[in-house]
A protein has these predicted regions:
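Non-transmembrane functional regions of envelope-associated proteins
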Residues: 2-197
Length: 197
C-alpha cells in the first residue's frame, strides 16, 4: 500500500508542486492588488457586451442642460427652481429627486422654495459628505450641505466611490459616518419613496 502511494506521488509530483505554488502566487497577487487593473478591464468589457436595457417609461429625468444655463444663467434662481418643482409636483409623482446643491439661497424666491421643500414629503434633496476613506476606496471632497429647509429623512448622500483608474463603477446604498450614524444614499432614498408609493 505504501509503495502505491509513493508511486502515485512520484508520478504526480509535478502537479503536486505546481498547483499549490501557482495558487499561492495568484492569492498573493490578489492580496496586494496586482490583478485589480486586469479584473476591472474585464468587468468593463463584460458591461460593454451586455445588451442595451430598455428605458422604463415610468421614470422621467428632468435635466438642466447648456441651453437652460444660457437662457436662465447658473446657478438657477430659487424662484425659478420653485416654479419647476411645483410643476413637477402637480403631476403627482411618487418621488422627486433634486440632485442640485442648494445649501444656501440663490437669487430671489428662497421663501417659496423653502415652503415647497417643507410641503413636499416625496422630495429628496442631495448632500455630499466629505473625506470618507475606507480600505477599498477614498472619497475626498468638500461637504455640500443639504437644503436647510428639508427634513433629515428627505436627504440623501450623492457620494460615489472612484476607482484607482478614475472611473465610477459602483454606487453606495449608505455611508457610515465617523459619529456612528448612517447616511442613506440619494438613489436609495428615491427608490424607497418610489416603492413605498
Amino acid at each position: 500500500m505504501a509503495g502505491h502511494f509513493k508511486n502515485f506521488l512520484w508520478k504526480w509530483r509535478g502537479v503536486a508542486i505546481t498547483t499549490p505554488a501557482i495558487s499561492l502566487v495568484v492569492i498573493g497577487l490578489r492580496l496586494i492588488g496586482a490583478l485589480e487593473p486586469v479584473e476591472l478591464a474585464m468587468l468593463d468589457q463584460f458591461f460593454r457586451w451586455r445588451s442595451p436595457e430598455t428605458t422604463d417609461s415610468r421614470i422621467v429625468i428632468i435635466g438642466i442642460d447648456e441651453a437652460d444655463v444660457r437662457q436662465y444663467a447658473w446657478p438657477i434662481d430659487d424662484a425659478l427652481l420653485a416654479q419647476l418643482l411645483d410643476k413637477v409636483r402637480q403631476q403627482k409623482p411618487r418621488a422627486i429627486g433634486l440632485d442640485l446643491a442648494r445649501d444656501k439661497p440663490v437669487g430671489t424666491g428662497y421663501s417659496q422654495l423653502a415652503s415647497l421643500f417643507k410641503s413636499t414629503p416625496n422630495l429628496v434633496g442631495a448632500t455630499k459628505i466629505a473625506d470618507l476613506v475606507s480600505s477599498n476606496f477614498a472619497i475626498t471632497s468638500s461637504n455640500i450641505e443639504p437644503p436647510p429647509a428639508l427634513p433629515a429623512e428627505q436627504i440623501g448622500a450623492i457620494n460615489l466611490p472612484v476607482d484607482a483608474d478614475g472611473r465610477i463603477r459602483r454606487g453606495l446604498m449608505a455611508l457610515g459616518l465617523p459619529d456612528g450614524k448612517i447616511a442613506t444614499s440619494f438613489s436609495l432614498q428615491i427608490a424607497l419613496l418610489y416603492l413605498d408609493g
